[in-house]
């Protein structure tokens, strides 16, 4: 059940990642398309060279191809979620902008490892398998030992016959025999062609393999607990850093737009600024999803990923409140048209 919860959660956030990626790339495509229109207008009035138009066109085509790939990725992730849950979802809740970033409690990596080694369901299953394998060895060894069986039986006979006693014949005499037996049977195995010894060796090897499985499972559980704990800790810092990076890229795009309008920044600079903002948006969203999955993975390692824990995480999600810092849509740059008497610069083709 705990593994299923994590599988569903991972597939769920994969869908959200695909949605956010598609949304960001579509926004970028729209902005780049506007930039291409503006570049074409500026080229027509002689303000820029044809290279700026070609750069914008190439960026527009690349963005369009990216959107097509994003749609395919979104459809695939939705199908994977539907495969697990058996349901098709029109809308999924996303983390709100005020989603809490909570440190693990207890805030001690070694304590989480101890809890995991004690409660991890996979490790517990491995230990039970080893115990069963050990008992099977005892059963196989018992094939060499004498055995005592208690056999009990009862027979009842009834018939009718004629009997002659001292010259007198009696017809229809009933004969009844009621017999009871209890027997102790001792069986001493002498030689069975090596069958019993082979069964013992097989059981012993299976027991050894089961014990090795416990060791391997213990190591994997410890690694999973440490990795998930560090994933939560680093995930908090990662989300905070990427949120700041998102705001910085928004500011950088505004500055680049202003520079492009007055001619101090090129169209390539503007395209790069847009790409950086789109990447920052996607990275911020993915980091938050990764943080939530790390929280659930840590709970899985500790064997505490249950319905109440899932309900608690579900309170972080919303379908109405903003899910990311406000990103202002870049203003459309109006082409600067020179006065009628201004000299027209030569266009380089």
Question: Which positions does each model-derived feature cover?
Answer:
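Acidic, low-complexity, intrinsically disordered peripheral segments
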Residues: 283-349
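Amphipathic alpha-helical coiled-coil segments
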Residues: 4-23, 34, 41, 77, ...
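Residue-level recognition of short, well-ordered coil/turn positions
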Residues: 47, 121, 264-265, 304
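A small-residue-enriched
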Residues: 6, 78, 83, 87, ...
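Short beta-strand/turn micro-motifs at beta-sheet edges
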Residues: 99-103, 171-175, 220
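Short, electropositive, low-hydrophobicity segments enriched in small/polar residues
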Residues: 50, 90, 197, 267, ...
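Periplasmic alpha-helical coiled-coil/stalk elements that build and connect Gram-negative outer-membrane
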Residues: 3-115, 231, 235, 255-258, ...
């Amino acid at each position: 059940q705990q593994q299923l919860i994590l599988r569903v959660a991972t597939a769920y956030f994969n869908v959200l990642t695909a949605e956010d990626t598609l949304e960001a790339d579509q926004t970028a495509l729209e902005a780049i398309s506007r930039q291409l229109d503006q570049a074409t207008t500026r080229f027509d009035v002689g303000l820029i060279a044809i290279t700026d138009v070609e750069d914008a066109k190439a960026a527009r085509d690349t963005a369009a191809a990216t959107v097509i790939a994003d749609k395919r990725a979104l459809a695939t992730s939705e199908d994977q979620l539907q495969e697990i849950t058996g349901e098709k979802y029109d809308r999924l809740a996303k983390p709100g902008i005020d989603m809490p970033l909570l440190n693990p409690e207890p805030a001690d990596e070694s304590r989480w490892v101890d809890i995991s080694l004690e409660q991890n369901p996979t490790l517990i299953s491995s230990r039970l398998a080893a115990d069963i394998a050990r008992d099977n060895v005892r059963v196989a060894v018992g094939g060499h030992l004498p055995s005592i069986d208690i056999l009990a039986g009862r027979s009842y006979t009834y018939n009718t016959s004629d009997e002659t006693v001292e010259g007198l014949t009696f017809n229809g005499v009933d004969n009844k025999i009621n017999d009871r037996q209890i027997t102790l049977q001792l069986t001493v195995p002498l030689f069975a062609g090596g069958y019993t010894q082979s069964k013992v060796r097989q059981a012993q090897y299976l027991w050894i393999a089961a014990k090795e499985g416990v060791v391997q499972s213990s190591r994997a559980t410890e690694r999973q607990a440490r990795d998930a704990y560090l994933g939560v800790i680093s995930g908090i810092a990662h989300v905070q850093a990427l949120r700041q990076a998102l705001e910085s890229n928004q500011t950088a795009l505004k500055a680049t737009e202003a520079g492009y309008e007055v001619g101090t920044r090129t169209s390539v600079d503007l395209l790069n600024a847009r790409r950086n903002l789109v990447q920052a948006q996607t990275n911020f969203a993915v980091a938050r999803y990764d943080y939530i999955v790390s929280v659930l993975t840590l709970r899985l390692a500790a064997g505490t990923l249950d319905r109440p824990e899932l309900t608690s995480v579900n309170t972080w999600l919303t379908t109405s409140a903003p899910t990311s810092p406000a990103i202002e849509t870049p203003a459309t740059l109006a082409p600067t048209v020179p006065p009628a008497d201004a000299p027209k610069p030569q266009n380089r083709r």
